Amino acid sequence: MNNDMDKIFNPASGEAEEFINHQEILDTLQYASEHKNDRELIENLLEKAAKCGGLTHREAAVLLECDVPDLVDRIFHLAKEIKQRFYGNRIVMFAPLYLSNYCVNGCVYCPYHAKNKTIPRRKLTQEEIRREVVALQDMGHKRLALEAGEDPRNNPIEYILESIRTIYGIHHKNGAIRRVNVNIAATTVENYRRLKDAGIGTYILFQETYHKKHYEELHPRGPKSNYAYHTEAMDRAMEGGIDDVGIGVLFGLNLYRYDFVGLMMHAEHLEAKFGVGPHTISVPRICPADDISTEDFPDAISDEMFERIVAVIRIAVPYTGMIISTRESEAVRRRVLELGVSQISGGSRTSVGGYADSKPEHTEQFDVSDHRSLDEVVGWLLDLGHIPSFCTACYREGRTGDRFMSLLKAGQIANCCGPNALMTLQEYLEDYASPETRAKGQQEIAKALEHIPNPKIKAIATKCLEEIKQGKRDFRF
């Protein structure tokens, strides 16, 4: 009879319980606990990580457990250095777009669960999607993350594909959605191939928790209850031709140490099997919502530990983009932007139809902590010295998968991303920004131009910025 103890850890395996191996996680947690004050080991790990080659799951676990104050300070300092080296001061902007909250699953932490009779169910028509996208374009968004519950009857793959075509086809005034990322349930290789052919950017799927027994308790019914099928979804996505995948856990569902190690092992697995790790790692935390109370989840983590998790992920997986949601407050967002986060949402609505409707029904998936408009978030980022980026050039220029990662790991991606961020910010300032934000943005663009080291790239970027001011759009390196 097979059980967890029969499985042997193998990061290159295609079997969930081998590349996310329960016993290896337990052994790693014990090792980290035993070595959390081992100064020589931790200093060696920091020295290794400073070379930007990443760390193993076991090495990362030691840094997460470390409680020596001066070494913890060095962990945070190194995370900031690595973030700056790979991503500079650029922060990619996006917005979630909820298509439908119909769902057949029984996830006990999500208000969309099938037995919740208090939440109004809604699925957007293509005309309603058009209105949502126009509203998003009028804010200035260029990049969306599609969200939909799992319901084969109400939300079949054909509906998702039609919605993607609708979104890409809408050009309102100077607006355009240039990259559609998709966060939908685990599906088949063939369906991933169809999503690829539809032109999606990143396929995103949160594991929720890597602890198999706890996962099955949290997902008692519905297709998502199949742990292996869910955990192996990214393998099928990459087999279907999707180059960029995004992983994440919902911190607070389970012991954070366990899920942190599982997350690192998943990144190692993708690198071992496909030669390219996750394009993004998301770090959501459990939060209140309709029919859901955080009091039911005793493993919720503090802001301080959340910041540590972000810092160690940045050190251990230096190349990955990191995403934080509007679940987090302005204060938490400010801190983790320094430590590792490279993408945030702005002006987000987590309800179906929430952008076009002035008074949407109570269909939110979770409560939002940051209620600021996109313009307010952009202005805030500029005040902090960040460059808000609406760039989607890598996806449209074919710099995806291993091609993107090789450029990023070699430190060459900044030659594209830096000027592209400035040009897309200039577009935003011309078309959507308030006068106050426009003034801040022009000042930051002027400063950033002076720091472009390549004279040829600087000259081209300067010329393009002037042409954007004259009404031209969509320049990119």
Task: Give a label for each model feature.
Residues 1-44, 48, 331-339, 348-477:
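Radical SAM enzyme core and accessory elements
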Residues 47, 51-91:
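An N-cap/entry alpha-helix motif that binds or orients negatively charged groups
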Residues 87-88, 92-128:
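Canonical Radical SAM [4Fe-4S] cluster-binding loop centered on the CxxxCxxC motif
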Residues 95, 133, 161-168, 192, ...:
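Generic structural signal for well-ordered alpha-helices
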Residues 114-131, 135-238, 243-253, 275-282, ...:
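Core AdoMet radical
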Residues 148, 202, 207, 228-292, ...:
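Conserved C-terminal portion of the radical SAM core fold
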Residues 218-224, 295-299, 363:
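Short glycine-enriched, charge-decorated loop/helix-capping segments at active-site entrances
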